[in-house]
Amino acid sequence: MANIPDAAVPDTGTIAGRLDRLPITRTHRRATVAVGLGLFFDFYEVFLTGVLSSVLVEEFSLTKAELPPLLASTFVGMFFGALLLGRLADRFGRRGAFLLNLGLYSLFSLLGAFSGSALMLLVTRFFAGIGLGAEPPLADTYLTDLLPARKRGRFIAWAYTLAFCGFPVVGFLARGLTEHEILGIAGWRWLFVLGALGAGAVFLLRRGLPESPRWLESVGRTEEAEHLVAGLEAEARGGVDENPAPPRGTTRKRAAAPVRELFGPALRRRTWMMVVFQILQTLGYYGFGTLVPLVLAAKGYAVSQSLLFAALTYLGYPVGSALSLPLVERVERKYLVVGSVLAMAVFGIAFGYSGSMALILVFGFLYTATSNVFSNAYHIYQAEIFPTALRSTASSGTYSLSRLASGAMPFVLVPLLNSSGPTTLFLVVAAALVVVAVDIAVLGPRTTGRRLESVNDEVAQPLR
């Protein structure tokens, strides 16, 4: 008889226990790729408007007062999308919310490609943002639910490593297409078309993903959860029946946990920690990526040069994400978040002071690389610290505040850049990042290598 790893043997324990005992299967890998590709187009889209900011100023003859609303429109849409779709994922399932958000984004990104005015582009960016808003927290929640504890961090980091390739891709595509017309259509419009078509392809890929067994169990659909876990166990043993027909029996459904539990005695410390974290971290993470072409223009570089430099610094995003792979399971994620965000503050100040092309590229690359060690660690971390019944609501709800802060960011940082220059801009950003580090260091629990139920048992009593 073939030797079967202990992790592959069906467990008679809970659904969560059996999921955590599984080895990595083909379904886990397929889910990681499908989630990573969806995130790829999320980040592609988020940075697209910022990368094109200098191009759109010329295309639509935008004034300094008209540019910030256009930059903010996607983020404001993402705020509403994260709130609405994140809650839907806890009430009606992760998979359906996944499909809805990609469908909305793909449709409105395609419509945005045919914008005849800045107003139409602003409106389509807003609705595309609604579709995109919940993508990262939904991705974090879904993979956190599905993956076994000992591999959770590494595979979520792999998904984000794939996703972060979207940053240099959009940078180099913008550099290559914006100065040309293809089939009589301006190159910048093709960037929106490519994003829409790519997201549509990922939509089709995600239709084959299973629902989260942890979520099914949390709402009382235990027979369906049992069926999915049994399929994963059979797959782990080399069985061929990976997706048999679900059972027809009825199950008792439970209502989703009320949102007020997030501010109850059990969870309010973690909730408020993430509120502060999400509002301030976006100044450092998206503030750099969105505004770097404008920062380079303020340093005296032409539009074409600033797009090239931005694309080169964006290479740090996938590199940093890849560097995080051996770290997220070996270093306590709480301290990895703290250390990397402090490094971002240092490199950001150095970038602001840089006056030569070489220093701009070096510190820009170091900043983006470090920021994705930070990003991977926190995306894993934020989903681990809330119980299954509220995981998507909590992750998406607090994440939505980062989108709202990103929407306000152009109205604060662009005038600051124009009035005080890049150095002052990055000093302000660094101060925000130091507060983020203190917030997590003081209030955050440890999570690395722990089962989700263990991380949340210490606060779960009032939820039972």
What would you call each of these model-derived segments?
Residues 1-464:
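Transmembrane-helix signature of 12-pass secondary carriers
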